[in-house]
Amino acid sequence: MKFAKDDLKLEEALKKEWIITNGIGGYGASTILGANTRKYHGLLVAPLIPPAKRTLILSKLDESIEIDGRKHDLFTNIGKNYISQGYKYQQSFIKEYMPIFAYKVEDTEITKVVCMEYSKNTVGVLYKIRNGKSKAKLILAPIMNYRDVHGINKNHTFNLTQIQKGRKIEVKIDDGKPIYMNISAGNYIEHNNDTFFNMFYIEEEKRGFEPEENHAVPGRYEIEIEPNEEKEISFICSLEENIEELDVRTIITKEIVRYGEMFIKTELINNRKENKSEAEIERDKLIKSFLIAGDNFIIQRPLFNTYSIIAGYPWFLDWMRDTLIAFEGLLLIPKKYEIAKKVLETCVRDIKFGLIPNGYSEGDDRPLYNSVDASLLLFEQVKKYLEYTKDYKFIKEEMYGKLESIIINYKEGIDLDDNNIYMDTDGLIVSGTENTQNTWMDAKYAGIAVTPRNGKAVEINALWYNALKIMAELSTDNKEKAKEYEKLALRCKSAFEIKFYNKKRKCLYDVLGDSKIRPNQLFALSLTYPVLDPNSPVAKEMFETVTKKLLNSYGLKTLAKGEENYVEVYEGDGFRRDFSYHQGITWTWLLGLYYNSLKKLATNTKNKTERTQYENRLKEFVQDVTKTFSKEINERGCIGSIAEIYDSKKPYLPKGAIAQAWSVAEVFRIIMEK
């Protein structure tokens, strides 16, 4: 993933971003020019209570180089009416394990590597200078803040206190925690009430948010470089106090070793040193890119002593719905089985009245129970976990009772947080109210549901049937229980087949009474136990309707073109974006449902000719997804990851969260099709 000078033209380069993470919810992110275009950008965004209370600490490190008294600014900053010119000195940007920037000024070459220490709120920047024939001076100015990641700081002055102990600087901004900086060379010059005014975030303006922000500039570093000298400078900024002995080279080495061990453990990389074909080399590069992308979302939850999965950067925390959909691609395929077990423990840790939390609040880690599907998705991933690990002991001892409580409560009724979940007399699950958004299509604006899906939703009942069948399978040592689960499953299936088929539109109702064509109907075919017989005409008819109306290269549209309120471009202020979120915009993770469904047809169709056709379509689909996203992960949006959503018309621009767990996980799962 290398961008040469010709690839760094301002307008296009500002649309390309990068991200690195620290395994506890913190991250560093910006554009490939180092210009911050979002309030979420920064070299150190640190969770004060991991993974929550994320706080912007170090926005940027602005570099200048002085050669024979001539000062050249290497940084690129954006104001409302200006863009500084540092990008003109940039020669390249590379992103593999971490971002690498290269600059050239006269005959002096500068390389910068940005990294994060794993499981610590620490960012490191390593500079390598190859000086030319003149004496030079590198000047580094930390642009700092201390505010909530979702906020903006309009302070004109900052209450700064600084303590210098050797090369270590302790900075306090307003009432924030101490921030520690350390550098391997040079002198620190303290500034007096220096403020960076009106940094302009062009992406926030597009999103309808306040685009201008002020930052504190506590001081600057000056490092002398002799003629023809080669010098390495290590800069660290951290919320961890003991950083005196830490150097950036060590952080980089540890991260590369950690990734290397991960690659070996997955057994997905061809480790043969010689005689590898060009195709094998490219395949291995692609797998490594996805493994690194996926690893960014896996986090420790120290207070729980467990692990979880961040739904998406830069603004989401861990959501159990997203975690469970990403579970196989991020944890099981890469053989991260112990972490997978810890993630399942996280899911059920705060189960209440048969509901697992959909997530936790940013401020106080309070469990939020706004989901009808997360608890049912758990069954599918327990089944997958068993297929990969055969760890029946853990499931029986730690999970079975929790799964049983989900079935009991869904059957008898759950009023918690207005979820209004219960099993109707026909065996189908009802959930929600007009303004309860508890399915994945959960957009709300000003308290009003944009896509109300209360009642009997298609995917909820497909998941309910699947959960009952899996519980019957897990209850083989109790024949009466197993029999009861099978009986409930049959009742659900019978009602589903009669009530959800929309003969007129050759598909399934999205919610009973709602004939809009949406992708949720694929759940009826894509799970371990599909509620629709894959060999049935209804299943095949539904699949063809979805293919024709919703599928494109980057995912599935959330609503068919021609339906009322259809939107195909995600843009504008909060209202416009929330309104369009599930009204035609393309979601990449839905490719996983489509893939599962096509696979069911390819393996269960009894007619040999027809089955061969599905097999060929499956092969072609996997090839198309691989081709599209091997390019996407390397060239557009967040380099080295995949976006949350895409526009539904060419050029299918990436939108939403710049890096989304279930997008990465589901595409990776498809790419790894044997």
Each model region followed by its residue ranges:
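Acidic, mature catalytic/reactive cores of soluble proteins
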Residues: 1-674
